[in-house]
Amino acid sequence: MKIAGDILANLPIGRLSPETTSGKQGFIHPTTVEGSSEKAVIRFIIRDFTDEKLNDHAAELRAVMDTILKRYPNSKATLEIKEQYRNMKKILDKHPQVVDYALEAIERAGMKATRNSIRGGTDGSRLSFMGLPCPNIFTGGHAFHGPQEWVSRQDMEKTVQTLVELVQIWEERA
């Protein structure tokens, strides 16, 4: 547990954390710490908008771990990186009609469409890399993944209207 604590204490301060970055800045974020005196596990999420920066963040995390382990010569650690979410833009750019249709559906449902990047991972990213280009559209939700997460009935209705319009657009263009 001491080693895990030292690893956490030596993560970059003032940069590369969700609370100190914004927009298209990536981050390294510990999500779970479990352990006892003989074994500890730390789970992180690493997010960024390019594969190169994701690799840089993973290398930085490995460097922190390696540096800390030098202080504990009789200990060992492993770092396992599992791909979770990548930037779906590279897939969506190959299928521009998918985004165009979504934007049109939003307009048809009576709203002004805007395009934004999000910093979290989404199912749309996984689906896009599995061969089903899938941009994120709005749900109307607020304060995602927190105890105050909510969505209004009116926003849910607009989401449903958008989805109906989207299905109609795909049928019209088929």
Located regions from the model:
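Active-site-adjacent substrate-binding region
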Residues: 8-18, 28-29, 76, 84-134
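His/Asp/Glu-rich mid-to-C-terminal helical/loop segments that flank catalytic regions of hydrolases
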Residues: 1-17, 53, 60-64, 104, ...
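Short connector loops/turns at beta-strand edges and beta->alpha or beta->beta junctions
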Residues: 35-36, 133, 139-142
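Midchain, well-structured core segments that form catalytic/ion-binding scaffolds
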Residues: 1-56, 66
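Active-site proximal loops enriched in glycine and acidic residues that flank catalytic Cys/His/Asp
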Residues: 32, 44-48, 58, 81-83, ...
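Hydrophobic, well-ordered secondary-structure elements that form the walls
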Residues: 44, 102, 127, 137, ...
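Metal-dependent peptidase/peptidase-like ectodomains
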Residues: 37-39, 47-107
